Amino acid sequence: MKVIEVKHPLVKHKLGLMREADISTKRFRELAKEVGSLLTYEATSDFETEKVTIDGWNGPVEVDQIKGKKVTVVPILRAGLGMMDGVLEHMPSARVSVVGIYRDEETLQPVPYFQKIVSNIDERLALIVDPMLATGGSMIATIDLLKQKGCKQIKVIVLVAAPEGLAALQAAHDDVEVYCASIDQGLNEKGYIIPGLGDAGDKIFGTK
């Protein structure tokens, strides 16, 4: 499984700001979108381009355009919504598929409760977005679902990943690619990433 920890200074700086204990909902939400946007830039760096002739201001001109890439952005509810707009800034025509999965706080197991997937998922690259890859359970369940629907190309974009979650994802789906802003120390006894970001969903939606 390909894992890319993006070490760009802007990514590291913005992620560091997100770790502050007393960060406001507004600021956390803004930064989640910004870091998500920067990670998308990296995750799409292998897109193929082709030469196309267009009408320029002074006549025909040959330009590069992305070669027929169909994409669906897949935010995992609810926290993934906080990163979605940052991805769509770069690909405003991308379709959006939504998967609702929450983690049972006692068993730490993923519990699916909603899905709305584009009909031609088998023709599209899926960019799954979620702030945290902790145990990996929710991500694995989401990828299971997408593959059951016929999806063949999947990339994962997360702000912070735990080594335990990456190992679990590797064991379940070694054909995906993961792009993250940080691989953190690990999980505590409650399954939270340390140092992590806290509860990203609560911070994005102001429900903490």
Curated annotation (Swiss-Prot):
Annotated residues for binding of uracil: I193, G198, D199, A200
InterPro entries linked: PRibTrfase_dom (IPR000836), PRTase-like (IPR029057), Upp_B (IPR034332), UPRTase/APRTase (IPR050054), Ura_phspho_trans (IPR005765)
Cofactor: Mg(2+)
SUPFAM superfamilies: PRTase-like
Cofactor binding, note field: Binds 1 Mg(2+) ion per subunit. The magnesium is bound as Mg-PRPP.
Protein residues bound to 5-phospho-alpha-D-ribose 1-diphosphate: R78, R103, D130, P131, M132, L133, A134, T135, G136, G137, S138, D199
Biological role: Catalyzes the conversion of uracil and 5-phospho-alpha-D-ribose 1-diphosphate (PRPP) to UMP and diphosphate.
Protein name as catalogued: Uracil phosphoribosyltransferase
